[in-house]
Swiss-Prot record:
The modification N-acetylalanine is found at A2. It comes from the Eukaryota. It catalyses: a ribonucleoside 5'-triphosphate + H2O = a ribonucleoside 5'-diphosphate + phosphate + H(+); 5-methyl-UTP + H2O = 5-methyl-UDP + phosphate + H(+); CTP + H2O = CDP + phosphate + H(+); ATP + H2O = ADP + phosphate + H(+). This is Cancer-related nucleoside-triphosphatase homolog. Its EC number is 3.6.1.15. GO terms for molecular function: ATP binding; ATP hydrolysis activity; CTPase activity; GTPase activity; ribonucleoside triphosphate phosphatase activity. Belongs to the THEP1 NTPase family. The modification N6-acetyllysine is found at K165. Monomer. It comes from Bos taurus (Bovine). ATP binds at residues 9-16, 109-116. The keyword NADP does not apply.
Amino acid sequence: MARHVFLTGPPGVGKTTLIQKATEVLKSSGMPVDGFYTEEVRQGGRRIGFDVVTLSGIRGPLSRIGSEPLPGKRECRVGQYVVDLTSFEQLALPVLRNAGASGRPGQSICVIDEVGKMELFSQPFIQAVRQVLSIPGTVVLGTIPVPKGKPLALVEEIRTRKDVKVFSVTKENRNHLLPEIVTHMQSSRK
């Protein structure tokens, strides 16, 4: 049976909301859960970027709408957003590196929301995700984008792993998926 669960679907369909709800249910049933999710940042009703938020409540910028790049400075951009790699790595990497640190098999769940274009500018993040997926005692609950344009190597690698179950989230099924996701996560730990 697939051990890890990844949600996929178009932007704004409710992947992060489902992750947050599943996390609450799993935590309240006594499972150790750690990780991070991404959240829109809005100003005056307009999206200006994304924050990365750890499950322990630490928040930092992932990206913001950018102005012109500074001369000579290499900038990581996705569309109009400039990615703050330093901030992202300071928050996400320690969480991923601590995954499975309890050392007891089947004892931890690691939330990775998301493995997407912005996050994949970070080579250490790519390595850390691969490592977490291979730790025997760790189950990953994550999100990946819908394939469009040029394939993202790590996303395709995750999508095709034998130990990963991918749920496609749609407006039609998003309100019914939670019990299935939670049940799968709980049975993956046994």
